[in-house]
Amino acid sequence: MELLAKTRKLNALLQSAAGKPVNFREMSDTMCEVIEANVFVVSRRGKLLGYAIHQQIENERMKQMLAERQFPEEYTQSLFNITETSSNLDVNSAYTAFPVENKELFGQGLTTIVPIVGGGERLGTLVLARLGQEFLDDDLILAEYSSTVVGMEILREKAEEIEEEARSKAVVQMAISSLSYSELEAIEHIFEELNGTEGLLVASKIADRVGITRSVIVNALRKLESAGVIESRSLGMKGTYIKVLNDKFLHELAXLKTN
């Protein structure tokens, strides 16, 4: 397959995504097919975002690593020493993707490391490995193109996470600001009693202890539930089951107490 045809195959994957998140597993499969190598897309912390195997490596440690989708921490950290594409590293290299305990089996193993960079920061690493055949310029062009695409996708996901985080925080702040002084006091006592993200409590006991009416507690819970911050369910005589749905809620509540 010529370089242009291989590039078009990668482009076809991106075009089929059409604004949707690119699946790192599919991306790895396509890279594996066009570059004809084992492909590992590794995050900054060593998480395997995607991988595809062209040549099976019979090694228990490697199999466990793939099952756990996690590269060893020491190896992941060492990858940050590589700041530009390093190709055709042999099995004696500290960066080899082949199991060092089986060097005699993988003497022909070659590894190529491609940093994934986006927005001026290191986002991860693309690791390619194959037996025998060297990585040529065409392979490296495809690898660097792929790493750019992966970098853009990681940046997009990070931007979405930040946006979602801000949205969750805003929802919590609005829900808390909708509470009256007595309702806020009730909520503080409820989650002090709950001491976690979910549990069972008896509203009337809290009302008696704090010196507020049960209706204040009911109204406060209803406001938080309608905002999607918590879920509550009456279990009759047993009390009310409460579960926090928005992970920003308890942090914001704690911050209010310290102010």
UniProtKB/Swiss-Prot annotation:
Gene Ontology CC terms, in alphabetical order: cytoplasm
Domain of life: Bacteria
GO MF terms, alphabetically ordered: DNA binding; DNA-binding transcription factor activity; GTP binding
Gene that this sequence comes from: codY
Family: Belongs to the CodY family.
Cellular location(s): Cytoplasm
Organism per entry: Bacillus cereus (strain ATCC 10987 / NRS 248)
Residue span of region GAF domain: 1-155
SUPFAM superfamilies: Winged helix' DNA-binding domain (SSF46785)
Start-end of DNA-binding region: 203-222
Name of protein: Global transcriptional regulator CodY
Function: DNA-binding global transcriptional regulator which is involved in the adaptive response to starvation and acts by directly or indirectly controlling the expression of numerous genes in response to nutrient availability. During rapid exponential growth, CodY is highly active and represses genes whose products allow adaptation to nutrient depletion.
Record's keyword annotation contains Cytoplasm: yes
GO terms of biological process kind: negative regulation of DNA-templated transcription
Entry-annotated residues carrying Phosphoserine: 215
UniProt cross-references to Pfam families, sorted A to Z: CodY (PF06018), HTH_CodY (PF08222)
Keyword vocabulary terms for this entry: Cytoplasm, DNA-binding, Phosphoprotein, Repressor, Transcription, Transcription regulation
InterPro entries cross-referenced by the UniProt entry: CodY, GAF-like_dom_sf, GTP_trans_reg_CodY_C, Transc_reg_CodY_N, WH-like_DNA-bd_sf, WH_DNA-bd_sf
KW Cytoplasm (keyword) present: yes
